[in-house]
Amino acid sequence: MTRQTITILLIFFSFSCNAQQIKIGTWTTRDGGAYTGEIVSGKAHGKGTCKYPNGNTYEGEYVKGKRQGNGTYQFADGERYEGQWFQDQQHGQGTYYFMNNNKYVGLWFRDYQEGHGIMYYYNGDVYDGNWLQDMREGEGKYTFSNGAYYKGSWKSDKKNGKGEFNWGDGSSYVGDWVDNMKHGKGLYKFSDGDSYDGEWKNDLQDGKGV
């Protein structure tokens, strides 16, 4: 018997053993969820559906009793997550549908919106940029439904650092921001062609400027 033949037989035997271990059955999670689907060694492993006492449901992949892989989690209040899971947490690429009709499409880290993602707001606004623990953080662009936009730095869900705000009517501001206010040095161009280049404090012109 050749080495290649032996290798093929070993692979076939391994798959056969794994197939024998997988059963279709029921299982109860630690938090009282009723699972129905593929089971290995007495735990959810593979594809299945779980219904929880609070009305939430999950349909997707499991690894050793935990949500892992791809799956959809439907909340009783109408919110829904579709995407990747790791160790029972929303982790990787996923889409979240909020009860208020907002929709987030992007990266997740341990149940948080983290990394690059796009939030489509119910009123037509869109944010495309970086996130940290469910908040806008780092570089990103927020476009309002009327065409106005802010492009620049964010911290703790607010405009902070260097950024540009364009109102779409010919007026714009490029400069420093602190907690959503023009603060520091910046250039404001008015729609009539005038401009102010100088210091700002709490959203108002302050100190020297031209």
Kindly label every feature range from the protein language model.
Residues 25-26:
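A structural motif
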Residues 34-45, 57-68, 80-91, 103-114, ...:
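Conserved anchor residues at repeat-unit boundaries in beta-strand-based tandem repeats, strongest
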Residues 4-15:
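Sec-dependent N-terminal signal peptides
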Residues 49, 72, 95, 118, ...:
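Extracellular beta-strand solenoid repeats
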